[in-house]
């Protein structure tokens, strides 16, 4: 059986990324895909980009990667852009928005946020409490499976069986109309306490952990066989990452420090 580690939303947190990579390699996994948002939030975007380039077979583009590579980047993004330099900014700008492959007879499609852009929001954790937001932002979960021009697809292309995405920083796996959808959560900026109403005032020890997904099956096989999706949580030294932030001149770092400690939105 083959294993693929799917990570996302590292957000310049080199401490969390190192912890997750150590966990991945300790499991004998060598194939790693990243679904975007490598930068912003934390203060080591240059180190994170270089580490991802060294270790990931696939890196996709997220909305923060787009914002940092824009000449009109806002203050916090501009700070990160200056730190990464032009070559890394060009690298982010040219990243693909989608990856797909067959695994154990299932077509798996990966993107950062949705088939429509790198910034649409679909969060099933809101489905019961806030259907209006779901409808406004994206609508039915089946829209995640659409073949869109943004992805470089045509209506005649095969429809995926499994969708994997990041962006919302809330890990989950669920089935819908015989399809499978998973979210990796975030390596570098877990904010699960903010995204799930059931966790309000709950113990945040587990919500502050980095998360990623392991797919297990036969890679590049169209023949139906055993397939599994596993969600992994990894502790990392939050205070070490906070020390990096405190010693930096990055704007807005106080909100990021609070988020790292509480898993709440900044």
Can you say where each PLM-predicted feature lies in the sequence?
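Beta-strand-turn-beta hairpins that frame and shape the catalytic cleft
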Residues: 1-5, 100-109, 176-180, 223-227
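Core catalytic region of metal-dependent phosphoesterases/phosphodiesterases
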Residues: 2-93
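Active-site environment of divalent metal-dependent phosphoester hydrolases
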Residues: 11-15, 40-43, 64-70, 116-118, ...
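His/acidic metal-ligating clusters that form di-metal
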Residues: 27-28, 87-174
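Structural motif
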Residues: 58, 108, 161-162, 179-181
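Acidic, His/Gly-rich catalytic cores of divalent-metal-dependent hydrolytic chemistry
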Residues: 174-266
């Amino acid at each position: 059986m083959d294993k693929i580690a799917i990570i996302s939303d590292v957000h310049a947190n080199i401490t969390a990324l190192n912890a997750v990579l150590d966990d991945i390699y300790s499991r004998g996994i060598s194939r790693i895909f990243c679904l975007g948002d490598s930068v912003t939030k934390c203060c080591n975007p240059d180190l994170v980009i270089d580490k991802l380039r060294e270790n990931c077979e696939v890196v996709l583009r997220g909305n923060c990667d787009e914002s940092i590579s824009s000449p009109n980047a806002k203050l916090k993004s501009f700070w990160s852009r200056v730190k990464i330099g032009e070559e890394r900014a060009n690298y982010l700008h040219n990243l693909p928005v989608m990856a797909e492959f067959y695994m154990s007879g299932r077509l798996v499609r990966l993107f950062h946020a949705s088939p429509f852009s790198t910034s649409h929001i679909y969060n099933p954790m809101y489905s019961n409490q806030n259907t209006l937001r779901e409808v406004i932002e994206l609508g039915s979960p089946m829209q995640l499976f659409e073949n869109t021009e943004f992805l470089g697809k045509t209506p005649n292309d095969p429809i995926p069986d499994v969708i994997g995405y990041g962006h919302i920083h809330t890990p989950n796996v669920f089935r819908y109309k015989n399809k499978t959808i998973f979210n990796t959560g975030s390596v570098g900026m877990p904010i699960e306490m903010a995204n799930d109403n059931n966790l309000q005032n709950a113990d945040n020890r587990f919500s502050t952990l980095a998360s990623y997904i392991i797919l297990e099956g036969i890679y590049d096989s169209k023949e139906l066989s055993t397939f599994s999706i596993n969600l992994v949580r990894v502790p990392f030294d939050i205070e070490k990452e906070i020390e990096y932030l405190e010693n930096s001149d990055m704007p807005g770092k106080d909100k990021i420090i609070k988020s790292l400690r509480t898993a709440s939105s900044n």
